[in-house]
Amino acid sequence: MFPMVTEFMNYGQQTVRAARYIGQGFMITLSHANRLPVTIQYPYEKLITSERFRGRIHFEFDKCIACEVCVRVCPIDLPVVDWKLETDIRKKRLLNYSIDFGICIFCGNCVEYCPTNCLSMTEEYELSTYDRHELNYNQIALGRLPMSIIDNYTIRTILNLPEIKT
């Protein structure tokens, strides 16, 4: 008779323990119910990127002195700089500059160490294509300024700031 009583006591303790675990999980679920959704309707809503966002690199051809500092500081030696030495003025003349964004890791070293500030990071992050060879940008494509999502009236912008609870 005693084994049956102890089994009923163990069953009761297990039931109470299971109810407590279910209650704890339910409390966590309820604590998340008051939060705003994290997901957005992407093509129609876009987050405003932060000030130091590392997007596509913008290149200004006129400022570049072909010093190749960007190539030396790049961890993967990515920028391709073609130049010609002008002997009469003893300066390098830039012929071609290109970056392959299929390989770029967007570390920002080239932008940080450029002595003439001809490189800068933009807020553009939509670089997907069907052909990987389209990701190889020359100086003309790098010089194109990105269209700001703030100026596009068909896209609703969402400011990504943490809420301050009062």
Curated annotation (Swiss-Prot):
GO terms for cellular component: chloroplast thylakoid membrane. [4Fe-4S] cluster 2 binds at C74, C104, C107, C110. The lineage of its organism: Eukaryota, Viridiplantae, Streptophyta, Embryophyta, Tracheophyta. One of its GO terms (biological process) is photosynthesis, light reaction. The gene is ndhI. Belongs to the complex I 23 kDa subunit family. This is NAD(P)H-quinone oxidoreductase subunit I, chloroplastic. It comes from Guardiola tulocarpus. It is an enzyme of class 7 (translocase). [4Fe-4S] cluster 1 binds at C64, C67, C70, C114. NDH is composed of at least 16 different subunits, 5 of which are encoded in the nucleus. GO terms for molecular function: 4 iron, 4 sulfur cluster binding; iron ion binding; NADH dehydrogenase (ubiquinone) activity; quinone binding.
